[in-house]
Each structure stands twice: as C-alpha cells, then as structure tokens.
Amino acid sequence: MNILSIETSCDETSCAVTQNGKKVLSNVVFSQIKDHQIFGGVVPEIASRKHIQFMTLVLQQALKEANLTPQEIDLVAVTQGPGLVGSLLVGINAANVFAYTYQKPLLGVNHLLGHIYSAQIEHEINFPALVLLVSGGHTDLFYLTDHLQIKPLGTTLDDAVGEVYDKIAKNLNLPYPGGPLIDQLAQQGKDTYHLVRPYLKNDNLNFSFSGLKSTLVNLVMKQNLKDINIPDL
C-alpha cells in the first residue's frame, strides 16, 4: 500500500510517501525558518501563506522522488490537528482535492500520533510502552497498552519545552530556532547559575516550565547581557 501523507500543522510544509507502513519512498520538507527568524518565533499568518505558496510544489516533488503517479497512491493521510488553524487548513484542503480528484480514501490524523508512531519506522513498539513526546508545541507523557490504546499521564501546565527554548533564545539575542543552539552552548558551559528546577515536588506527572523561563528572563533583565556567559546558563 502506498500512502501519501501531508503535514502542515505549524511552519513546515511536508509531504511523504510510504510503502506498507514502513518503507519511506520520499520525504519532502519546505522549511520556513528564515521567514520567521526575524520575529523570534512562528507568525501564524506568514506560516499559512507560505504553505499555500509551496504546498503543490512539495506534493509534486514527493511523488516524483517516490517515482509514483497519483493513480498509484492508495490512501491519503493528512494532519487534522492539533496545530495552527490556518496552516492546518492548507494541508487539509490539499488532501481533500487530491483524494477527490483521484478517488482515493482520505484519513485525518492527529499529529501527536504521528510523532508516537514515527518510532515504529525503525523499531516495533513493544507494549506496554511509555512515551515522552517533546515537540515545538507539546510536552506530554503517554502510556500505551496497545495500538491506539493511549492513556495520558501528564502534560505541560503552561509552556512546552520547545516554546521555552525559543522564548529564552529571544531574550538572549540568539537566533531562531533556539533549541539546537542552546543545546550546543550548554555542552560548553559550567553549572554557574542555579536556576529553579520546576514542578519536581508534586504527586502527579505533569510538567511546568514557566517558572524556569521567568527566572532566566528576570536574570537577564537584572544583569547586563554582555556580562553573562550564556553557556553557563
């Protein structure tokens, strides 16, 4: 079975073609990083416009790299949420048009399930399984007893880890996206600043990162940024 998958939940236009659920025939991604860098984060209106601009090109390239015609696609899958509404609509509309034009079945997918099941491309998931899902807009802990039998154990009560990285990077005058560079700098630093370690003494499995973000932002505001050795943070 050849599946065409379309993902536009945030700021990347992506189409992939997989065969029998395992073999990736193509995976084409148009990144908008440069378009959002000057703002230090994703601007929803810009994201949706860029999806409109590049959706058709990305889809055509995915089919080309997979060496398949539209008629050879057996199923169309598309992210239906969660995500930015304007961005999601572009992908959903493209999937609907493709499915209607070529008379293919259409499947809407929760993109968090996409994150979870991407692990299965290389390794089978052995149940029961514990999943820590960390992405740009989500930080969640799930317990899986079987396929699609998912119990939420915990989630962030405020900011997702990815959001915290980007907001902190902006306050430190670091480029967007902040995560990769902050990770690199952290490898070089010393444990000089003892920042708050959030939400450790609680009887649940939720997360909270707003306190850590606020502590660092306040530290930067109180001191001259030039006097702070960023890797030590």
Swiss-Prot record:
GO function terms (MF aspect): metal ion binding; N(6)-L-threonylcarbamoyladenine synthase activity
SUPFAM superfamilies documented for this protein: Actin-like ATPase domain
Family: Belongs to the KAE1 / TsaD family.
Required cofactor names: Fe(2+)
Residues bound to substrate: 133-137, 166, 179, 183
GO biological process, one term: tRNA threonylcarbamoyladenosine modification
Binding note for cofactor: Binds 1 Fe(2+) ion per subunit.
Function of the protein: Required for the formation of a threonylcarbamoyl group on adenosine at position 37 (t(6)A37) in tRNAs that read codons beginning with adenine. Is involved in the transfer of the threonylcarbamoyl moiety of threonylcarbamoyl-AMP (TC-AMP) to the N6 group of A37, together with TsaE and TsaB. TsaD likely plays a direct catalytic role in this reaction.
NCBIfam families linked to this entry: gcp_kae1, T6A_TsaD_YgjD
Gene Ontology terms: cellular component: cytoplasm
Pfam families to which the protein is assigned, alphabetical: TsaD (PF00814)
Compartments, as annotated in UniProt: Cytoplasm
Gene symbol of the encoding locus: tsaD
InterPro entries registered for this protein in UniProt: ATPase_NBD, Gcp-like_dom, KAE1/TsaD, TsaD
Predominant place of localization: cytoplasm
Protein name, entry field: tRNA N6-adenosine threonylcarbamoyltransferase
Catalytic activity: L-threonylcarbamoyladenylate + adenosine(37) in tRNA = N(6)-L-threonylcarbamoyladenosine(37) in tRNA + AMP + H(+)
Keyword field: Acyltransferase, Cytoplasm, Iron, Metal-binding, Transferase, tRNA processing
UniProt binding sites for Fe cation: 111, 115
Enzyme class: transferase
